[in-house]
Regions:
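Flexible, polar/acidic helix-loop-strand segments at domain edges
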Residues: 343-408
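Membrane-proximal, proline-rich intrinsically disordered regions
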Residues: 21-74, 319-333, 338-343, 351, ...
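Conserved, well-structured interaction surfaces
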Residues: 87-165, 200-205, 216-227, 398-403, ...
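Short, surface-exposed recognition loops and adjoining beta-strand edges that mediate ligand/DNA contacts
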Residues: 28-36, 65-69, 164-178, 223-317, ...
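Sec-dependent bacterial lipoprotein signal peptides
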Residues: 1-20
Length: 544
């Protein structure tokens, strides 16, 4: 899978390969061949999203090659909030964390480009099998499958646009690609068209693909009830609309778009029936951030069955500091400055180890936790992401963690920001205060950001501080930081970041504008002159 042209065949092959590891295998003895094929295509998409060796580089030892969870870890590594607390020689995400080797010639570009276009082709394959000319003529199964496919495709294009749109920054200039997103591939796209497929305008991708797909998904899933948190639901569609309208609001400085974001965020909260994580659920040493069924907060997540777990190619091996099965421990922790910005009355602070280990009775799945936390883990190391089922010594069990893609808490943050951005600053302050006081403060403590929110800018800075804490490690906030032109800082006196990671970026980071891989520009030469500048090495590490 080196370019879009090759992805159609690859997607078909991947679907067949994945069908064997999908839970609840297709009942071929009672289904028609067409039904089996369609169901296999639909079920193959979420299985592909957690597949290792999805780009083919894992077979060469690239331990970053495990699909969407790896993408989330890559973007998180670019924020400045995540630091490596162990042996940096074993950090497989060092390119993203240190801004090296991110140009078109490097394999890491396949993680986003090849994967997303493979998944888009899989969604297209479902869409082209169902006659969408009249939704009312479809049966319930066809409606749900088509709704899933539209939701998936919208989500994939939304991510691609947010990754690859060139946004102005202080380090690179590319006026010729301003306003451009990515090539659009639809079921009707021919091979000849794919060979001459320029980057579409961002506005067109939103107006002609993302929003129409989400509208279709909303209509098709209006009366559908998802059986579990692993299945696309109407609430997820509303959540994707909230994300998309928030992006449009900022890009266009459009109060109406912000109002739409707030409205859809509230609809997602209502439709999901979800409630934010409790302190007990957040700190659960067995199920913390690894199980869709152990809480009421997840809107949508991905299951990684144990038979599909590879030792070094899963999210848990890189993000859980408690596991014992890896031959190395790069370890991930929080930026020291960000840690000390967390209110001591906020239970989220317990996600990372304080230098004074006796400051809190940290929970763990390990019987030797007290000694292990003191002697084996660095200060500020995270214990947010737990080995599945608490199996810290068995990668087949402990690595088989569910992966969260949307929590209801994100909708509370979108609603608060969008309300303020739309002109109701007092309303945004009230919403953030209510969320934090009701769901994050301990022992009856009250959170009040009023004194920090005299201006809209002040409020957004405070909201983003809380959002960065809330979603640390989950692959959410880089998109917000890019959207809002935020700075990041790992270099300062007392930093806990290794020397090569101490990047201080004023405003939007140049490496948040992802570069299209060379194999694509070779096979689709019209975009060879439309690529984003290579940001590698443009930000020198802070020397002190």
């Amino acid at each position: 899978m080196k370019n879009i042209l090759k992805i159609s065949a690859a997607a078909a092959a991947m679907t067949l390969a994945l069908s064997g590891c999908i839970k609840d295998a297709t009942p071929t003895q009672i289904a028609t061949e067409d039904q089996v094929t369609l169901e296999t295509l639909v079920r193959g998409i979420p299985a592909a999203l957690v597949m290792y060796n999805s780009t083919g580089y894992a077979q060469d030892g690239a331990a970053w090659d495990f699909s969407l969870p790896a993408i989330h870890l890559a973007t998180e590594s670019m924020t400045g909030d995540l630091v490596v607390t162990g042996n940096i020689g074993y950090d497989w995400f060092t390119q993203w964390g240190t801004n090296v080797s991110l140009g078109s010639d490097y394999a890491v570009g396949a993680l986003t480009w090849d994967n997303y276009y493979t998944w888009i082709m899989m969604a297209n394959n479902v869409i082209k099998q169902i006659d969408a000319s009249d939704f009312s003529s479809l049966d319930a199964t066809q409606k749900s499958y088509l709704g899933f496919a539209y939701a998936y495709r919208a989500m994939f294009y939304l991510d691609l646009v947010r990754l690859y749109e060139f946004k102005e920054n202080n380090y690179t200039e590319a006026p010729e690609v301003l306003g451009l997103g990515v090539p659009v591939v639809l079921p009707e796209t021919t091979e000849a068209e794919a060979k001459n497929n320029p980057r579409a305008k961002v506005d067109d991708i939103y107006d002609k693909v993302i929003f129409p797909d989400l509208d279709n998904a909303e209509e098709l899933l209006e009366n559908y009830t998802a059986p579990d948190k692993y299945t696309i639901s109407l609430a997820l569609v509303y959540g994707l609309k909230a994300r998309a309208w928030l992006e449009r609001g900022t890009a266009k400085e459009d109060n109406a778009a912000y109002a739409q974001a707030a409205e859809y965020a509230r609809q997602a909260i209502t439709a999901s029936g979800c409630t934010p994580l409790t302190q007990e659920q957040w700190e659960d040493p067995t199920n913390g951030f690894n199980s869709a069924t152990s809480n009421d907060a997840w809107i949508w997540g991905l299951a990684l069955p144990s038979e599909s777990v590879a030792n070094l190619f899963c999210f848990t091996v890189h993000m859980s500091c408690e596991n014992d099965w890896a031959p190395y421990h790069a370890g991930r922790g929080i930026n020291r400055n960000l840690y000390y910005s967390i209110d001591s009355r906020d239970f989220r602070r317990h996600s990372w180890l304080d230098p004074d280990r006796s400051s809190y009775a940290y929970k763990s799945c390990r019987p030797d936790a007290d000694t292990y936390f003191k002697e084996s883990l660095a200060d500020f190391a995270n214990i947010k992401f737990r080995p599945a089922q608490g199996a810290y010594a068995d990668y087949k069990v402990g690595g088989a963690a569910d992966h969260c893609c949307m929590r209801v808490e994100e909708m509370y943050f979108i609603e608060a920001e969008a309300t303020a951005q739309a002109g109701d600053l007092a309303g945004g302050i009230r919403l953030l205060n209510e969320f934090m006081t009701s769901y994050r403060m301990m022992n009856g403590a009250t959170y009040d950001c009023t004194s920090k929110s005299g201006t809209l800018e002040g409020f957004i800075n405070e909201l983003m501080l809380q959002k960065r804490i809330e979603f640390w490690g989950e692959g959410i906030v880089m998109f917000d930081m890019k959207r809002l032109d935020m700075s990041s800082k790992r270099g300062y006196v007392g930093t806990n970041a290794p020397s090569s990671y101490r990047l201080n970026v004023e405003g939007r980071a140049p490496y948040w504008n992802f570069v299209i891989i060379r194999s694509e520009t070779q096979n689709n030469p019209v975009i060879a002159t439309q690529n984003n500048p290579d940001p590698s090495g443009l930000v020198e590490p802070w020397k002190g």
